[in-house]
Amino acid sequence: LGFQGINGKGEIIKSGGTVVKNVTGYDLSKLITGSFGTLTILTELSIKVLPKPEMSKTLVIKNPHLKKALDFLGKALSSSTDPSGGVFYPDYFGKNFVLNDLTHDGGLTAIRIEGPINSVDQRLDRLSKELSLLDQELSILDNEQSNIFWSRTKNLDVFKNLKNNLLRIVVPISETLQVIQKLKNYEIKYFIDWGGSLVWATFDKLSTKILNEIRNIVKKHQGYVTLIKVEEDLKASADIFTIDPIRYKISDKIKRSFDPKRIFNPGKMYTGI
C-alpha cells in the first residue's frame, strides 16, 4: 500500500500509506514493486494481507487434453463460483502428485475453491455441473490435500530436479493453445497456471538462437518470456526479460530519474539499465 525508501540520489521518498485511497501515489508503489530493486532501497513498507480462507478444496478433472483443459479453466474462471486457482498438468507430470483423494496418475486440470465451508461445497457442486462433469471424471481434494497440491504447484515441485533451462511465459489465455502448439517443435515440457495465462516451460536445448525464436513466437501472441534458469553461457549473453523497444525507453527514463548513476542493481532487468 505504501513505502518509504532512498533513491540513487540519496533522497528520501515516500508513497502511499496504510490504507488504499483513490488518490495519486499508489501507482508509484506498484512501480517500485516491479522494479527488482533497481530504483530504490526500501526502508519501510505498508502491506495489505488477507485472512487465511476457512476452507480450501480442489476440483481435479482427469486426463483432459490441452484444448479441453483450457476450455474448462476459461469457463471456471468466468463463472460465479469464484475460483482462486486454475492449473493444467500434462500426462508426464501426473505421477508427481500422489495424494489419497487423487484417484488417477495421468494428466489433470485442477481448480481451487476457497472460503467458508458451506460455501465451498456448494460452489464445487455448482462448478462440476456447469462443466458437465461425470463423477468418474473428477476427484475432490479436501482441505489438507488441496493445500499440499497448491504448495507443490507454487514451489514448482515438478521441476525440483531440473538440470535443463526453465522459462516463465505469460500470454493472454486466448493465445495459450497456439503458443504451446508452436513451441512443441523445441522439445518443450510444461505446465500451465493462472487459469491458462502462465506457462512454466523447460527445454532440453536452449541456445541464443532458439531463445530468440521462442521470444519472437511469444511476442507475436502478445506475451513475454522471463528466464528463470539457464546455462551460464546463455545467462551471460541474454536478457532475463523480453525487451520491447518502447518499454525499454520508458524503463531507461525511469531509471535515470530515480538512479542516474546506476548504483542499484545495474543490468538486473535489462542490459544498460
Which residue ranges define each predicted feature?
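C-terminal substrate-binding/cap subdomain adjacent to the FAD-binding core in PCMH-type
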Residues: 3-162
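Conserved glycine-rich FAD pyrophosphate-binding loop
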Residues: 11, 134-273
